Amino acid sequence: MEQPQEETPEAREEEKEEVAMGDGAPELNGGPEHTLPSSSCADLSQNSSPSSLLDQLQMGCDGASGGSLNMECRVCGDKASGFHYGVHACEGCKGFFRRTIRMKLEYEKCDRICKIQKKNRNKCQYCRFQKCLALGMSHNAIRFGRMPEAEKRKLVAGLTASEGCQHNPQLADLKAFSKHIYNAYLKNFNMTKKKARSILTGKSSHNAPFVIHDIETLWQAEKGLVWKQLVNGLPPYNEISVHVFYRCQSTTVETVRELTEFAKNIPNFSSLFLNDQVTLLKYGVHEAIFAMLASIVNKDGLLVANGSGFVTHEFLRSLRKPFSDIIEPKFEFAVKFNALELDDSDLALFIAAIILCGDRPGLMNVPQVEAIQDTILRALEFHLQVNHPDSQYLFPKLLQKMADLRQLVTEHAQMMQWLKKTESETLLHPLLQEIYKDMY
């Protein structure tokens, strides 16, 4: 069996070569331990001290005067010295892997699957090398640089937040709160953004959605290729727009149900007066729906029927007025909202914040609602700082989006009232009538 070899001057020269090939990517190590100040979750923002590791990385600085990340070697558990060959590794395992690859060493096979730890890592080189490979270590990782800057900053933010949570119970509570909201989101919403984007980008294991781009393909979809609810036949051509509108209503009603169940899972929502719960849902569901609609939209159209179908933007534009006018503003909002690149964990908190707005008309206990929303907003701000360390102004941008959504829903409600007068034969679902009544 090949015996372990210690680092040599030649190996140290190879290390210099590795750094050069990695375009000078900085090591993720530093000086004294740095923890998140306990004063506020906002300390992770751009207002942090310029000497913090997070600020250093945001400014693109390689050196760090403070802030050890305390990363463990993925192979043996020793303290990692940096990101080597694609994983965090200590100097010993980095050198071991480099020698094995460059000298093309072969070790005596071992079938015991030895546990590799710092104290015994030199005992079984075969299992040590196999673990390196299993973790994804590769000599090619050097040629592509080391850790991407965006990934590195996200990692640093997460680790810094984790350290902050250990020293600040309030931050730990916010983290647990965020996780609870996210789990409620995953539990109650059938179509997540992750699922929608995988379908839209063709990465889903499911069949590609059936594309509806004209009356003929709509008819095929109605015959059972897309929707589970079958119809006897399509209406006359001039009523196609009404038929599509009914389909939209059906989806909206189902989403209102999902939002109601989601709201029940928001801590302290169910302790509110029942009238306040109804009021919050009445004014909040459409804002939430239009925010979530962006997840299933791209520039070419939107997913329908739980991802089984895709209606093109051009087909929706071809509908007669006022139905085409109803849909277009939602598309415009979706494109801008998608540019923020939120994920489902962000959306979960954003949707919760929309529902728990203390300035809704007719609330009986405003302070109680505001207290819940304040917790949600603090959790959202902290979560965004960790999840999007490169986007310093994402939180205020989302607050602006909440205002934009309110305006969008106000215009939508007015359009529904106008539709009720001008399209007398077009029926609104009873639940939606209740929501729109005296809304704005």
Curated annotation (Swiss-Prot):
Expression sites (tissue/organ): Heart, adrenal and intestine.
GO CC terms of this entry: chromatin; nucleus
Classification via InterPro entries: 1Cnucl_rcpt (IPR003074), 1Cnucl_rcpt_B (IPR003075), NHR-like_dom_sf (IPR035500), Nucl_hrmn_rcpt_lig-bd (IPR000536), Nuclear_hormone_rcpt_NR1 (IPR050234), Nuclear_hrmn_rcpt (IPR001723), Znf_hrmn_rcpt (IPR001628), Znf_NHR/GATA (IPR013088)
PTM info: 'Lys-48'-linked polyubiquitinated; leading to proteasomal degradation. Deubiquitinated and stabilized by OTUD3.
UniProt cross-references to Pfam families, sorted A to Z: Hormone_recep, zf-C4
GO BP field: adipose tissue development; apoptotic signaling pathway; axon ensheathment; cell differentiation; cell population proliferation; cell-substrate adhesion; cellular response to hypoxia; cellular response to lipopolysaccharide
UniProt entry tagged with the keyword Zinc: yes
Start and end residues, zinc fingers (NR C4-type): 73-93, 110-132
Location in the cell: Nucleus
UniProt superkingdom: Eukaryota
UniProt biased composition (Polar residues): 36-53
The entry's keywords: Activator, DNA-binding, Metal-binding, Nucleus, Receptor, Transcription, Transcription regulation, Ubl conjugation, Zinc, Zinc-finger
DNA-binding segment(s): 70-144
Recorded GO MF terms: DNA binding; DNA-binding transcription repressor activity, RNA polymerase II-specific; enzyme activator activity; linoleic acid binding; lipid binding; NF-kappaB binding; nuclear receptor activity; prostacyclin receptor activity
SMART domains for this protein: HOLI (SM00430), ZnF_C4 (SM00399)
Domain NR LBD: 210-438
Renumbered residue ranges of the record's region Disordered: 1-53
Stated family: Belongs to the nuclear hormone receptor family. NR1 subfamily.
Oligomeric form and interacting partners: Heterodimer with the retinoid X receptor. Interacts (via domain NR LBD) with CRY1 and CRY2 in a ligand-dependent manner.
Function summary: Ligand-activated transcription factor key mediator of energy metabolism in adipose tissues. Receptor that binds peroxisome proliferators such as hypolipidemic drugs and fatty acids. Has a preference for poly-unsaturated fatty acids, such as gamma-linoleic acid and eicosapentanoic acid. Once activated by a ligand, the receptor binds to promoter elements of target genes. Regulates the peroxisomal beta-oxidation pathway of fatty acids. Functions as transcription activator for the acyl-CoA oxidase gene. Decreases expression of NPC1L1 once activated by a ligand.
Protein name per the record: Peroxisome proliferator-activated receptor delta
Native source organism of the sequence: Mus musculus
Gene: Ppard
